[in-house]
Structure formats: C-alpha cells, structure tokens
From Swiss-Prot:
It comes from the Bacteria. It holds the Pfam family eIF-1a. One of its GO terms (cellular component) is cytosol. Keywords: Cytoplasm, Initiation factor, Protein biosynthesis, RNA-binding, rRNA-binding. This is Translation initiation factor IF-1 1. The keyword Protein biosynthesis applies. Belongs to the IF-1 family. Component of the 30S ribosomal translation pre-initiation complex which assembles on the 30S ribosome in the order IF-2 and IF-3, IF-1 and N-formylmethionyl-tRNA(fMet); mRNA recruitment can occur at any time during PIC assembly. GO terms for molecular function: ribosome binding; rRNA binding; translation initiation factor activity. It is found in: Cytoplasm.
Length: 72
C-alpha cells in the first residue's frame, strides 16, 4: 500500500481507550478507532477528549484510523 491510498479526514476525539487508542467521531458522523502515529508518539503529543484531529484511513479497513495531527 502506498501513501497515495490513504483517505484523510477531520474528526473529534470522543474518548480515551487503553494503549494510546481513541474513539474518534469523523465529520460525516462515523465513529472509528484511532491510534497515534509514530511521530506524534515520539514527540509526546498529548491527545484529550474534545481535541480536533486529522486521521488517515486505509481503504481496506474503514473502522480503524491513524491520528496524524492534533489541531491547536
């Protein structure tokens, strides 16, 4: 899978789950499980419920996402 295959969407973190996993509600109303990307983990970027985030979805599994950006 190349980087061109990902779908980027905006969403809001609804709740924290164990192991740096979050429930994210997307703009279109769908709720997905999201995990923090490696760079965000490396730079200790904290994510709290209510934060606006950008997630990447793969076309193969639309129920899971990678959180790549937290809006200020």
């Amino acid at each position: 899978m190349s980087k061109d295959d990902v779908i980027q969407m905006q969403g809001e973190v609804v709740e924290n789950l164990p192991n740096a996993t979050f429930r994210v509600k997307l703009e279109n109303g769908h709720v997905v499980l999201g995990h923090i990307s490696g760079k965000m983990r490396m730079h200790y970027i904290r994510i709290l419920p209510g934060d606006k985030v950008t997630v990447e979805l793969t076309p193969y599994d639309l129920s899971r996402a990678r959180i790549v950006f937290r809006a200020k």
